[in-house]
């Protein structure tokens, strides 16, 4: 009886080696695909993060600009009120105090030495320039078609400034919030922003800076 072959079959060994090599190559390829997919996802995540950061910064700058513009408008309005100036109003044509005084002066000169062609007319019969003054107030519009009307408009302007303080509520509250919110944050560091804003609104209701706490002048108040 012949002896069994004790050595390794070279063909079987070669086949196993090829299978192992193919499996290793397949595993390496799969691992590379997984790594590539991971880095692609990571890149997308980084890009989204950067995009959100840029959008947040853009919103912050826009909000800062709006606050600056609101503060500028509020300071401009306060400056006009302190200086006794009439507020700017939309109108198709405006008459300033200087123009009215100039019109009165010319009218006075005209009465003293009238033109021969105008002797038959009094200064009240000579109309002013069309739409000489049209002042659009917050409650409506007031037109000055004569010198007397124009003077009356100027005389009631200062009274009309604060008849409706609620018109300035939004700008005043924004300025109040910018001034007081940092103080509340410092005094209450553990509170959330929503809680701080609730406290701020309560202070605003009692604040003398609140236009609603200032005495409002009725629209038809007699002089």
From Swiss-Prot:
GO biological process terms held by the UniProt record: cell division; transcription by RNA polymerase II
| Residues the record lists as Phosphoserine modifications | 141, 194
Q: What is its main location?
A: cytoplasm
GO MF, any single term: transcription coactivator activity
Q: Where is the composition biased (Basic and acidic residues)?
A: 18-74, 99-126
Q: Where is this region: Disordered?
A: 1-126
The record, for Pfam families, names: Ccdc124
Q: Please give the coiled-coil regions recorded for this protein.
A: 15-82
Q: Which UniProt keywords apply?
A: Cell cycle, Cell division, Coiled coil, Cytoplasm, Cytoskeleton, Phosphoprotein
Compartments it resides in: Cytoplasm, Cytoskeleton, Microtubule organizing center, Centrosome; Midbody
Name the InterPro entries for this protein.
Ccdc124/Oxs1, Ccdc124/Oxs1_C, HMG_box_dom_sf
Which GO cellular component does the record give, naming just one? cytoplasm
Q: How does it assemble?
A: Associates with translationally inactive ribosomes in the nonrotated state. Interacts with RASGEF1B.
The record describes the protein's role as: Ribosome-binding protein involved in ribosome hibernation: associates with translationally inactive ribosomes and stabilizes the nonrotated conformation of the 80S ribosome, thereby promoting ribosome preservation and storage. Also required for proper progression of late cytokinetic stages.
**UniProt similarity note:** Belongs to the CCDC124 family.
Q: What is this protein called?
A: Coiled-coil domain-containing protein 124
Q: What is the originating organism of this protein?
A: Bos taurus (Bovine)
Provide the gene name from the record: CCDC124
